[in-house]
C-alpha cells in the first residue's frame, strides 16, 4: 500500500485487528521509506441494487433519501434517531440479502411502510397517505382502521 505521506510503494503491517463490530479489519502500518505510521481499514464492499422508478428510469440507491423520507414522516414524533438508523439498516439489509441487481421503488416504499408501522402508527398513516396518494377521507379512515385492527389482540 502506498504511503499517504511520501507516496512510497512499500509499507509494513505492524498490527492487524478485527473491529468490535466484526465488520472491518484495522491495520496499523509503517512506511519503510519515511518511517511514518498510519492506519487503514478493510471493509466488505457491498453494492446496493439500482432503484427502478415508476417512470422506468434508474438511479443509485440513496440511503440519505430513505432517511429523509423516514424523518419527514416521523417529524415531531417520539422516535429516537437510533430507532430511525436501525430501521434504515434493516431496510438496507433486506435489499442486500435479496441478491437482486435492481429493485422497484415501490418495494422500497413497502419496506418503509412496514418499518414505520413498527416505529410509530401516526408516522405510518402520514407516509401511507402520500405514498398511496390518498384522495379522500375514506382512505384515511381505512388506513386508521387497519392500524386499529392490528393493535387488537386476537381472541
UniProtKB/Swiss-Prot annotation:
GO terms for molecular function: ATP binding; DNA binding; zinc ion binding. The keyword Transcription applies. It comes from the Bacteria. Residues 49-139 form the ATP-cone domain. Its cofactor is Zn(2+). Pfam families: ATP-cone, Zn_ribbon_NrdR. Keywords: ATP-binding, DNA-binding, Metal-binding, Nucleotide-binding, Repressor, Transcription, Transcription regulation, Zinc, Zinc-finger. InterPro entries: ATP-cone_dom (IPR005144), NrdR-like_N (IPR055173), RNR_NrdR-like (IPR003796). Binds 1 zinc ion. GO terms for biological process: negative regulation of DNA-templated transcription. The keyword Zinc-finger applies. Negatively regulates transcription of bacterial ribonucleotide reductase nrd genes and operons by binding to NrdR-boxes. Belongs to the NrdR family. This is Transcriptional repressor NrdR. It comes from Janthinobacterium sp. (strain Marseille) (Minibacterium massiliensis). The lineage of its organism: Bacteria, Pseudomonadati, Pseudomonadota, Betaproteobacteria, Burkholderiales.
Amino acid at each position: 500500500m502506498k504511503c499517504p505521506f511520501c507516496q512510497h510503494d512499500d509499507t509494513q503491517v505492524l498490527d492487524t485487528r478485527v473491529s468490535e463490530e466484526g465488520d472491518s479489519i484495522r491495520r496499523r502500518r509503517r512506511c519503510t521509506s519515511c518511517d511514518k505510521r498510519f492506519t487503514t481499514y478493510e471493509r466488505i464492499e457491498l453494492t446496493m441494487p439500482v432503484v427502478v422508478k415508476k417512470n422506468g428510469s434508474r438511479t443509485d440507491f440513496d440511503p440519505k433519501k430513505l432517511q429523509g423520507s423516514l424523518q419527514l414522516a416521523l417529524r415531531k414524533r417520539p422516535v429516537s434517531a437510533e430507532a430511525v438508523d436501525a430501521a434504515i439498516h434493516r431496510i438496507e439489509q433486506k435489499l442486500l440479502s435479496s441478491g437482486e441487481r435492481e429493485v422497484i421503488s415501490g418495494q422500497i416504499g413497502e419496506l418503509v411502510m412496514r418499518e414505520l408501522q413498527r416505529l410509530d402508527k401516526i408516522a405510518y398513516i402520514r407516509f401511507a397517505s402520500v405514498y398511496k396518494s390518498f384522495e379522500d377521507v375514506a382512505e384515511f379512515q381505512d388506513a386508521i382502521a387497519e392500524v386499529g385492527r392490528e393493535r387488537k389482540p386476537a381472541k
